[in-house]
């Protein structure tokens, strides 16, 4: 059977919170089959566990934020994206603040941590959410959509109308049957505009944001000396975000995702719309790994990645 996965050993790192600017400790721990991805605020007098789920996402203005009883864990999308890319079903994520450290602004550090810990198959069938009917959410000209597809593919279009972004790819289509998440998506960094960063700092946000963890643009150009990691890094990062946003549903999706100018809020609304229609999806497992879509019947160390 195609099995669930966790990590083999505990792994730790320290990074900066993009909004608080503070040093944050992050610990990843193995979890039993059926646990899911569970975030734990271990800095509180009594630690609070917040399982990743579509219904636990609250604030989505600047990141995907998990909330439970007034306790928050922000900026979960890059770590969730790495878990999706490496096929991690079960994981405890201990964090000492209300945000996951930003690291280099991509998912690459989290991929490295998980691969360093080692990936272990578990004696339980991996559960997929198979989309059986189209589901769509629109907001003005923005939209996000899921269609039935035996596999996982994404098509994302952006439109920032900025000279530096316009010169790069504005549209990307990826099918993980034939594309490596680790090589092609994981290293794409978040990006932002210098004038927006100043405004955010004035209201106490983005205190940890810098060219060490983001692509920074002024009105005309990229300010980072080292340029881009991919020719189409902007749209690739939006896809990286979408993969993480979608993975909070708790299982990998078997679906085709299409989006135009979507963000964390629209992605979460799409998941809620899917879950609201029980006839639009079903839970499936694969007794024979070879019967799973290409890209999911991976060996123990890689991903649809």
Curated annotation (Swiss-Prot):
GO CC terms: membrane
Matching Pfam families: LpxC
EC number(s) from the headed UniProt entry: 3.5.1.108
InterPro entries, per the entry: Ribosomal_Su5_D2-typ_SF (IPR020568), UDP-acyl_GlcNac_deAcase (IPR004463), UDP-acyl_GlcNac_deAcase_C (IPR011334), UDP-acyl_N-AcGlcN_deAcase_N (IPR015870)
Assigned keywords, A-Z: Hydrolase, Lipid A biosynthesis, Lipid biosynthesis, Lipid metabolism, Metal-binding, Zinc
GO MF annotations, alphabetized: metal ion binding; UDP-3-O-acyl-N-acetylglucosamine deacetylase activity
GO biological process: lipid A biosynthetic process
Reactions listed under catalytic activity: a UDP-3-O-[(3R)-3-hydroxyacyl]-N-acetyl-alpha-D-glucosamine + H2O = a UDP-3-O-[(3R)-3-hydroxyacyl]-alpha-D-glucosamine + acetate
Binding site for Zn(2+): 78, 237, 241
Superkingdom in the source lineage: Bacteria
Residues at the active site: 264 (proton donor)
Pathway assigned in UniProt: Glycolipid biosynthesis; lipid IV(A) biosynthesis; lipid IV(A) from (3R)-3-hydroxytetradecanoyl-[acyl-carrier-protein] and UDP-N-acetyl-alpha-D-glucosamine: step 2/6
Cofactor(s) the protein requires to work: Zn(2+)
Described function: Catalyzes the hydrolysis of UDP-3-O-myristoyl-N-acetylglucosamine to form UDP-3-O-myristoylglucosamine and acetate, the committed step in lipid A biosynthesis.
Database matches in PANTHER family: UDP-3-O-ACYL-N-ACETYLGLUCOSAMINE DEACETYLASE 1, MITOCHONDRIAL-RELATED (PTHR33694:SF1)
Family: Belongs to the LpxC family.
Annotated NCBIfam families: lpxC (TIGR00325)
Name the UniProt record assigns to this protein: UDP-3-O-acyl-N-acetylglucosamine deacetylase
Organism, as annotated: Burkholderia cenocepacia (strain HI2424)
Gene: lpxC
